[in-house]
């Protein structure tokens, strides 16, 4: 069952990506998932969205460390290949790329995750902040081919300006 995000967002999926049911070890807390229509050797690249309202004292780097530790519990040779703080003072963000080996459906796979952490303010209550995490997971062989789609997707994510009645 998908989890509700702490603040509503809107986004546009890349062309041909398909909404999917969140599954797997890291699906707890996932609000939305999508899969690439062309799997690589049986593994479908996927995009997931989750989020939380962290205490003010928690940094984006603190939040980004958590999935690294979770991956180390279930995967082999987890390596942080890249981490960079981006955005502005008013809208900070953090990107990181993780490479790891994991057994998925009985097959050992070299996977790469590109993660983006966006700090967003609630449109209706600007004092309320949430961090939205966007994650692309793909095989090492397919990652670079789908990364552009993920980057295009990230550019469409913003707080939802239409309120529910």
Question: At which residue positions do the language-model features occur?
Answer:
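Surface-exposed amphipathic alpha-helical segments
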Residues: 15-17, 130-165
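Hydrophobic/anchoring residues in structured secondary elements
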Residues: 19, 83-85, 159
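Glycine-rich, often proline-containing surface loops adjacent to acidic residues and nearby aromatics
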Residues: 43-48, 92-95, 127-135
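Solvent-exposed residues in well-ordered beta-strands and their adjoining turns
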Residues: 52, 99-103, 137-139, 160
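A generic structural signal for short coil/turn motifs at secondary-structure boundaries
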Residues: 55-58, 105, 141-145
């Amino acid at each position: 069952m998908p989890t509700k995000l702490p603040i509503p967002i809107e986004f546009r999926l890349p062309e041909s990506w398909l909404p999917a049911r969140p599954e797997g070890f890291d699906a707890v807390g996932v609000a939305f998932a999508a899969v690439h229509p062309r799997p690589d050797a049986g593994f479908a690249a996927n995009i997931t969205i989750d989020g939380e309202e962290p205490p003010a004292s928690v940094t984006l780097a603190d939040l980004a460390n958590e999935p690294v530790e979770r991956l180390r519990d279930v995967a082999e040779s987890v390596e942080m290949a890249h981490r960079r703080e981006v955005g502005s003072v008013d809208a900070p963000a953090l990107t990181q790329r993780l490479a790891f080996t994991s057994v998925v459906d009985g097959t050992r796979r070299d996977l790469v995750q590109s993660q983006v952490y966006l700090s967003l303010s609630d449109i209706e209550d600007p004092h309320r902040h949430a961090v939205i995490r966007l994650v692309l997971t793909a095989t090492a062989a397919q990652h670079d081919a789908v990364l552009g789609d993920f980057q295009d997707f990230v550019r469409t994510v913003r707080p939802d300006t239409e309120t529910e009645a």
